[in-house]
Amino acid sequence: MSLATMKRCFCGFRHMGVLWMLAAMPVAAGTARIYITNHAGTTIQVVDPATNKVVQEIKDIEVPESVHFSPDGSRVYITNGAENVLTVLDRKTGKQIKKVPLSGHANDLAVTNDGRRVLVCIAETPGALDIIDATSLEKIKSIPTKSRLHDIVVTPDGKYAVATSPAGKFASVFDLQSEQPSWEVNFDQGALVPAIESGPDGSARRLFLQLSELNGFAVVDFAKRQEVTRIKFPDDEPSVVPSGTPSHGIGIAPDGRTLWVVSRSYDSVFVYSLPEVRLLGRVHLPELRLPGHDPIGGSPNWITFTPDNKTVYVANGADRSVSAIDAKTLKAVARIPTGEEPGRMTTLVLP
């Protein structure tokens, strides 16, 4: 998915139902932390990119799907797939503020740039985009969609949200002022993880997203409101048996100069220059080798970055690990053990 690095405050905490397993330590301004959800477990782990070690762990969140923060860092928002709620935590005290009931199974979430609303994808038929007021912590609106939603990103200028639907095979663009669907792009395959490239004025220029049967990614021109091309990964090496869709996980580096796209079929992440979309290289990721079986992929998926653009993190779902990659040398520098099926990751930075 696209970079979720934002300037936030960070603190370890303990509260009813959620526990920081390792003691919280003072964190200096400008320090980054990588938050990792474990989709088949009950934990969210926190990694210090300076050491690539897990420094804290949140427990007792059943099927954590996604984690984001309020702009001022005062709240933590977590979608809870098992309970169909948005769990809201106080960042300073660690106490649970509220569990906000949702319309159905909670998937990805996003926070509007002004912090006033939390947007949650409902991955349950018939599908919806739930809007939660961040002041009252009440669901104030549920926008019906043609099918269940998977992932969501807010455009850099804060004017739109883009949500994708694997089952419905579309990407829907929502106007955040009117809180209504604005336009959509339909595909011949399921629409998966999106990333948004901004233009010089901060507005959305291109949408990069993965499709359910494409070992590569599609490119949508935001102004034209249409798909303009598809890019396939080079097929110069034997593939492994992918666990899931061929390609799942995409992100744009903080400086906007590179696009990183995961291939499950090749158990790799490919790097492209922006705005040219020219292939720069690839990084091989861990494979699973079971006795008596052909190698299978480690199911690489989600991506995040350190704010200095130096390190890229890729979650390896089947391998129960996250790979830390040096963005300059394109070499893996660490394999970080995680919980069951690591998934969405978010980078947080102290102001």
Q: Model-derived features: where do they sit?
A:
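Short linear, low-complexity motifs centered on an aromatic residue
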Residues: 1, 5, 58-61
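Bacterial N-terminal signal peptides that target proteins for export
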Residues: 2-20
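Intrinsically disordered, low-complexity Ser/Thr- and Pro-rich stretches
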Residues: 1-2, 8, 253, 306
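Predominantly soluble domains enriched in secretory-pathway, periplasmic, or organellar proteins
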Residues: 25-351
